[in-house]
Amino acid sequence: MKRKAKTIIAGIVALAVSQGAMADDIKVAIVGAMSGPVAQWGDMEFNGARQAIKDINAKGGIKGDKLVGVEYDDACDPKQAVAVANKIVNDGIQYVIGHLCSSSTQPASDIYEDEGILMISPGATNPELTQRGYQYIMRTAGLDSSQGPTAAKYILETVKPQRIAIIHDKQQYGEGLARSVQDGLKQGNANIVFFDGITAGEKDFSALIARLQKENIDFVYYGGYYPEMGQMLRQARANGLKTQFMGPEGVGNASLSNIAGGAAEGMLVTMPKRYDQDPANKAIVEALKADKKDPSGPYVWITYAAVQSLATAMTRSASHAPLDLVKDLKANGADTVIGPLKWDEKGDLKGFEFGVFQWHADGSSTVAK
């Protein structure tokens, strides 16, 4: 039995990207964090979606029909994500690009699956999302199960630390990644001194830093997002701790440098490839810059690819029924700004690759050697 969507939901932001939608316009929900601690990631997502919709419509839309993005703020909060999902059901929208954080995507996906709404997430990396046999759930993001081993391989083969601490934020995304890295390091017989969690939103890491110093830790892997990592780096360096830090794409954000300052220099981070540096994407990069939008963020491109994939299936398929679009994408794939994409039966991408980058104090990054 399908869940009954709530008819009145408070605190939800829903803004049409284009005004005055016509009867033949195709509405697509764009869901991410406009508010909350990781709103910077939401900025990337919305910028990518807006540019993709603009470019697709400029080329004739979907057989003459325009895409209209309707934006919702879930703040990467699970409860708010459920409220947003119910709002989308009430709004009669059949297609969702989002959510971004794994912890908010999973509960929302339950509603979309029950209601027959196609969801393509550009950011949820936790493998559990697609392990439940759902038909309507897909993603253009890679998985923690591939990002974690990429980090572990680099740590074992390049860094070769002697005493490792693995820390996470006790959230689905961060802890999942931390455990994936832990598994990879254990296979390589690395010396993991401790594995522990902090509280998301925490700002005082004096006790943790004292512990790192006491245990002579020379390498820290942190599974989580940039607000906490930025504070850790800043406080560690202020206390004379020279330990190497590493994190996932959730920490690779210019806002980390705003928090950590010079302490951000040299942090290691696993991220998708730099799609803004692909010559094939030059026109999109220039369009984003002309609109005063940063084209360097990974979620700009992964979200653009999600919208592209949806549009490709709509153009190819005789039916716009969500399940027919899912079947089309799984059978035929899609050519996108991040390359040709293929999906398995669970809705996961085949062969998505992460790279290891060195972060710099000015918010830029270069491929790690």
UniProtKB/Swiss-Prot annotation:
InterPro entries linked to this entry: Leu-bd, Leu_Ile_Val-bd, Peripla_BP_I
CDD domains: PBP1_ABC_LIVBP-like
GO biological process terms, semicolon-separated: isoleucine transport; L-leucine transport; valine transport
Swiss-Prot/TrEMBL keywords: Amino-acid transport, Disulfide bond, Periplasm, Signal, Transport
Signal peptide (UniProt feature, chain positions): 1-23
Disulfide bonds: C76-C101
Role played: This protein is a component of the leucine-specific transport system, which is one of the two periplasmic binding protein-dependent transport systems of the high-affinity transport of the branched-chain amino acids.
Main localization (coarse): periplasm
Pfam (any one): Peripla_BP_6
Sequence similarity: Belongs to the leucine-binding protein family.
Identification of the protein by name: Leucine-specific-binding protein
Keyword Disulfide bond: yes
Places the protein is found: Periplasm
One Gene Ontology cellular component: outer membrane-bounded periplasmic space
Domain of life from the UniProt record: Bacteria
PANTHER family, per the entry: LEU/ILE/VAL-BINDING ABC TRANSPORTER SUBUNIT, LEUCINE-SPECIFIC-BINDING PROTEIN
